[in-house]
A protein has these predicted regions:
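Chalcogenol-based redox active-site neighborhoods
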Residues: 1-143
Length: 143
């Protein structure tokens, strides 16, 4: 598997807005409504990625820990179901329910949101503080 380097939005960049369906309950979620009072962690991830699979329990725990600090977590999958059918909304919902995600899992069918964030691989993490300015962009760990 090839390592794909992430692109870096400049720190301080305003978070792009988005409005995407939550696969868990089919509700449209907008960043303005779901962001946390102290910040928002946006994770680009997908079901089939071995790095996501490896980190998933840690991601779930981080989301719970962050919520206690007023930081919302949002996961977004932008993979094409033509090339990765296991990353489609039905499979995303199964995973979210099985793992009891405490955060919305959104589907970016057009991949427009991923492009706006310059997300190039999974998982990609973007931490925005409360004014929606990029504070931190990095991989979860060295794995």
């Amino acid at each position: 598997m090839a390592l794909i380097e992430s692109y870096m939005l400049p720190l301080g960049t305003q978070s792009p807005s988005f409005s995407l369906p939550n696969v868990i309950n089919n509700q449209i979620k907008e960043l303005e409504i779901i962001r946390g009072k102290n910040g928002t962690l946006i994770i680009f991830m997908c079901n089939h990625c071995p790095y996501v699979i490896h980190l998933l329990e840690g991601i779930i725990k981080t989301a719970i820990d962050f919520s206690k600090k007023g930081i919302a977590t949002v996961a977004i999958s932008s993979n094409s179901i033509k090339t990765h059918p296991q990353d489609g909304p039905k499979e995303m919902k199964k995973l979210a329910l099985l793992k009891r995600f405490s955060f919305p899992y959104l589907y970016d069918k057009s991949q427009e949101v991923a492009k706006n964030f310059q997300a190039a691989c999974t998982p990609d993490f973007y931490l925005f503080y409360n004014q929606r300015k990029l504070y931190y962009k990095v991989r979860y760990d060295d794995s």
